[in-house]
Amino acid sequence: MLLVDVANASADVAAMSARLAKVARIAELLRTAGRQGDARLVRVVVSWLSGELTQRQIGVGWRSVRSVPDPAAQPSLTVEDVDARFGEIGSTSGKGSQARRAALLAELFAAATAVEQVFLRRLLTGELRQGALGGVMADAVGKAAGVPSAVVRRAAMLGGDLPAVAAAAVTDGESALAQFTLQVGRPVGPMLAQTATGVADALDRFGGTALFEAKLDGARVQIHRRGDAVSVFTRSLDDVTARLPEVVDATLALPVTELIADAEAIALRPDGRPHRFQITASRFGRRGGTPDAGTQRLSVFFFDLLHADGVDLLDLPTGERIATLDATVPREQRVDRLLTSDPEAAQAFLDATLAAGHEGVMAKSPTAPYEAGRRGAGWLKVKPVHTLDLVVLAVEWGSGRRTGKLSNIHLGARDPATGGFVMLGKTFKGMTDEMLAWQTERFLELADGAAPAATADHGAAPAATADHGAADGFTVTVRPEQVVEIAFDGIQTSSRYPGGMALRFARVLCYRDDKTAAEADTIDTVRALHERAN
């Protein structure tokens, strides 16, 4: 299969708004791949259209593809060739590896046509936003293979790998999906939570009673044990066993021989309060597989059980899974929780959890099963919403459904000491179609100098520099006049921005035309919030 076939399909899907049309177009491509009888080919295509490489990370970022050779006139690259080239780039190491990687990348782009270069650039920089998320892809796999979507989703849930499920279904049919069962040692997609506005909202949505759990500001891990063999996986299913020996030891101390559990690994201070998130995250870095990738010891707290000693618990209600967890894990290694129908008791539990330095609470339906790999209605997260009034410093041209619109906004806090602004991050989250249309017109009016026009191959801009601008053809620097109200989950230490801080999970609430830039929140306010949280 030629790369251009995948690139054209990606462009088609990005231009479609109807879910059924997206599903049909992807299914058409998967059927074409399946007719070649190569399971690996199907797996690669599904991975790419999901915005991922089969190799996960190959050491290529925006700067690597910012300047590429002129495109080829005719398509010649095959999917197999490109996948092999990605593998070669990713495995390049040692002296001169950077130059070698650049040369391999240049050769690849020189052989690619214009539409292929656009696809490759977006794929390699994580900007392939085309609306082909997991649900759409699962439906497309089902349509291509003639398999009910529910069967595909279940297999992907248990196998933790939709591309592998797609390869089996498209090449060998529904019977091939029987191999995807819950297996100790093979990670499954974690169940995710929806959002509630508060504890009363959560109680109402669960019929009056809910299980509330402390939401720790650590790193979620999935732990597998068979005998003396323990594996620890991240939320994204990466194996981090060698980096977390204390988690392995804690698991081996439990009175079971087989186990699959959900837990939170977190760095705690001597007084029991959490360290800032970066301390925990340092133990999950990519600097090798030894504990010295971070020096702070982690504590592990278990909160759910998917399998215990030969018994699968996925389909059991939360209450029964928790009862098995309580019989397996000591109290001091379990996340704090409260089962209640009393809104005041639930609020007091939330307040105490926040006072202890944690993120908020999870509210869970006592009767819900574990929906692996899905954002299930049986789990709700309740966290305080922080907001800041910030100033837009620059905007990037969008991609996918945002093509032709100014989208990703650069956010800055006012610096009273200098009269300037300090960048704290970027976001396009929370923007409606109406907002995108309005802000495109607005920010072109505020453009500081000649604004670069949107082009067919625009993508995300590279990381912002200290002056927050980027003369890269994708970013429009604007006069710092427009105030925007931003919601965020926290403030983290960051070396990426000149203020040393960045917003976590920033999203747009609304534009504040009633405020001037002089009324925006200051960097001192942001710094105080950061220090208070840490």
Swiss-Prot record:
GO terms for molecular function: ATP binding; DNA binding; DNA ligase (ATP) activity; metal ion binding. The active site is at residue 215. ATP binds at residues 213, 220, 235, 264, 303, 375, 381. It catalyses: ATP + (deoxyribonucleotide)n-3'-hydroxyl + 5'-phospho-(deoxyribonucleotide)m = (deoxyribonucleotide)n+m + AMP + diphosphate. The keyword Lipid biosynthesis does not apply. Keywords: ATP-binding, Cell cycle, Cell division, DNA damage, DNA recombination, DNA repair, DNA replication, Ligase, Magnesium, Metal-binding, Nucleotide-binding. Belongs to the ATP-dependent DNA ligase family. HAMAP family: DNA_ligase. DNA ligase that seals nicks in double-stranded DNA during DNA replication, DNA recombination and DNA repair. This is Probable DNA ligase. The gene is lig.
